[in-house]
Amino acid sequence: MRRVVHLFLALSMLTLATNSRAQRTNVVRTTVRQIILTLETDTDTFKRSLDHALDRGPLDGTRAEDEINDYVKQFEHATDKLKDRAEDNRYAPNLAREVLIRGRSINTFMRKHQLGGDAGNDWARVRQDLTLLAAGYKVNWRW
């Protein structure tokens, strides 16, 4: 009888631990999905302010303008893939890493060309989102 009680207690503790782990996983997934949605919204805002800054600045019509537009397009595509994976509840650290790498290209451009104003502020928000994304996926990341 004592063995049965110990076995029951052990199974109960295992079940509780498993349920707790599952709940934590669901919280993490929900948080990561929210980060991705915020990232998309902030990226759209950044893209509009970047277009505005480029059209009214010395980079208008240059190869550099084409370059940053291509970086942003690739970044948005990678973010869309990550969002699709997150909506399917699939953990995708490699896609998160791709989004971060694409973001790094934009960051390098923004620093090199010193685009400030709304574009700079909006990019700073996107960078914060990316830092949260890296933490959510446990990706070691530095700018």
Where are these regions (language model features)?
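Positively charged n-region of N-terminal signal peptides that target proteins for export
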Residues: 1-4
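Bacterial N-terminal signal peptides
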Residues: 6-15
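N-terminal signal peptide c-region/cleavage motif recognized by signal peptidases
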Residues: 17-19
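Immediate post-signal-peptide N-terminus of mature secreted/exported proteins
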Residues: 21-69
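Generic structural concept
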Residues: 33-36, 40-43, 65, 69-76, ...
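Heptad-repeat coiled-coil alpha-helices
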Residues: 45-48, 52-55, 59, 81, ...
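Long, amphipathic, charge-rich alpha-helical segments that form helical bundles/coiled-coils
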Residues: 68-114
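A charged, solvent-exposed segment within the mature domains of Sec-exported extracytoplasmic proteins
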Residues: 111-143
